[in-house]
Amino acid sequence: VESKAKDFTLQYDWCAGSMPPPHHYEYTIRIGPGLEGEIVFHPDYPGLGAPEWTEPFDVAEEPLDALYALVKEQVLSREWVKVEDGTVGGSLEWMSGTADGQHFQVPSRVEEEEALEPVYAAIKALVPEAVWAKLRARREQYERDYDAG
């Protein structure tokens, strides 16, 4: 396995489709430099007094190397073309980062989207299950509090 580049950094954004508050949520996962990661979670539309929760986490070297290899193979090898399909509603995901001295940017809704599925799955898998569980619980509590209003 080739060692990951020293300059490997990545930011992945996921955003739920349009829904009335408090059911919308979005999050950003940042990886690198090195074995550091964090997830920033918005349990509602950002701004307007909605909270923002940040959870740092450690990234294990092996899955990070695997992600780096995937990014080199699946992401750096293509020109990403945004599809203007006019779709309204569904969730969106996009990412940007640096690998091998190359900056890359993948917009939401692109051609060859299926090539990104293993990359996005690997990014989400770097966040420990305990962190996801904590954020899910906080989000459910936020929705209950919102509904209790």
List each model region and its residues:
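Charged, amphipathic alpha-helical segments
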Residues: 60-84
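Second-shell loop/turn segments in exported
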Residues: 53-57, 106-109
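Short, well-ordered, aromatic-rich surface patches in folded extracellular/luminal domains
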Residues: 1-19, 77-149
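Short, solvent-exposed coil/turn segments at beta-strand boundaries
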Residues: 30-37, 100
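Residue-level detector of buried hydrophobic side-chain packing
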Residues: 29-31, 67, 95
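Short, surface-exposed coil-to-beta transition loops
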Residues: 21-27, 52, 88-92
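Acidic/histidine-rich, surface-exposed loop or edge segments in extracytoplasmic proteins
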Residues: 37-54
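Short glycine/serine/proline-enriched coil/turn segments at secondary-structure junctions
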Residues: 18-22, 47
